Each structure stands twice: as structure tokens, then as C-alpha cells.
A protein has these predicted regions:
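Active-site metal-binding loops of divalent metal-dependent hydrolases
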Residues: 17-19, 49, 64-66, 87-88, ...
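Beta-strand-turn-beta hairpins that frame and shape the catalytic cleft
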Residues: 51-61, 77-82, 130-133, 155, ...
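Binuclear metal-dependent hydrolase catalytic cores centered on His/Asp/Glu-rich metal-binding motifs
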Residues: 54-108
């Protein structure tokens, strides 16, 4: 799957809380050996916090859950700065509608970034009114507690103020269903 994605376009990846030991960040995560074995020039994997200047106009800012002490604000505000983060943000919602009032961080961590692309929460949702900070959700229904409207998001970002987002739903041929 990872190789197939990287064959299509540059792939930027960060690990999440299930990919390693958050209490021992120096321990090997589950993704690094896979990335090393693939040895693909189009895969950019970042376990540590920092910036990845993808183009002259675009910077990905990694806010790693394994390296929170080294989070930084954007260093070039002329670029489009996109924060990448895998974790819960206060007031995000789960598939069953439960609001996580106390996430690992507040939405304010993204205030200096132009956009925020998030992972961890499986329900697709925007966390701000403008739609700049989003969870795309998961690509497949994981269990009976999740809805079946899974898929992925497509951002089209022309500049800091002109962007669109759309959710593309994937057909699940074998959904979890409950018969009462």
C-alpha cells in the first residue's frame, strides 16, 4: 500500500501513537523498518518534529507526538505552512458522537499555521469554521462503533486564502452491521 502510494506521488508520513512507545521515544517504532526496507525516494517519513520544505511555496511542519519538546512555529511565514499532527484535539468527535472535551492538545496549537492535517480520530471532521484544520478520518470502518462513511480527503490549495476540500467516500464491501 505504501509503495503504491509513493509510486503515484510524493508520500509524506508521520507516525502516530499506535506506531511506537510514547513513553520511550528512543525505542524503534513500527513504521521505520518498513520505510527502510522499501527504500523509495518518494517516501518522506518524519518521526521527529521539524520542517519539510517541499517546494519554494510549501512547508510541512511536523508536530510529532514522539518529539513534542522540539515543536516549532513556522520559520517562513511567506510559505504555505501545513502542520502535520497525529493525536486528539480537544472537542473533536468520535464516530458515536462523543465529544472529547479534553484532548491531548487544544486547537490553538495550530494558530500560527495556515492549515492542519491531522490523524488519530477516525471520524472525518473540520475543527475550525474555515475548514483549515481537519481529520480526514479513517479509510475503512474499524468496528461496530464506527460509521461506514469512510474515505479520504482531497485538498486543493492554491494559496493561503484559496483552497477547497472534499471528502471522497470509499465503498466498503463488508461493513460491520448490527441486526437487532
Amino acid at each position: 500500500f505504501i509503495k503504491n502510494l509513493a509510486d503515484i506521488a510524493p508520500l509524506i508520513m508521520i507516525p502516530g501513537n499506535h506506531d511506537g512507545n510514547l513513553k520511550n521515544s528512543s525505542r524503534q517504532d513500527a513504521i521505520t523498518p518498513i520505510i527502510q526496507a522499501l527504500d523509495h525516494s518518494n517516501i518522506h517519513f518524519f518521526k521527529n518534529s521539524g520542517e519539510f520544505h517541499a517546494t519554494d511555496d510549501l512547508c510541512f511542519n511536523i508536530l510529532s507526538v514522539f518529539d513534542e519538546d522540539n515543536w516549532i512555529d513556522p520559520t517562513d511565514t511567506n510559505k504555505i505552512n501545513i502542520a502535520l499532527y497525529h493525536g486528539s484535539i480537544s472537542n473533536c468527535k468520535t464516530d458515536i458522537g462523543w465529544v472529547m472535551e479534553h484532548g491531548e492538545h487544544e486547537l490553538a496549537i495550530f494558530r500560527k499555521f495556515d492549515f492542519g492535517l491531522l490523524g488519530d480520530i477516525h471520524k472525518a471532521q473540520s475543527l475550525d469554521f474555515e475548514g483549515r484544520v481537519r481529520y480526514p478520518g479513517s479509510t475503512v470502518q474499524q468496528n461496530h462503533g464506527e460509521t461506514n462513511d469512510k474515505g479520504f480527503g482531497i485538498w486543493e490549495i492554491q494559496d493561503k486564502d484559496n483552497f477547497t476540500y472534499r471528502h471522497v467516500e470509499l465503498l466498503n464491501p463488508k461493513p460491520f452491521v448490527t441486526i437487532e
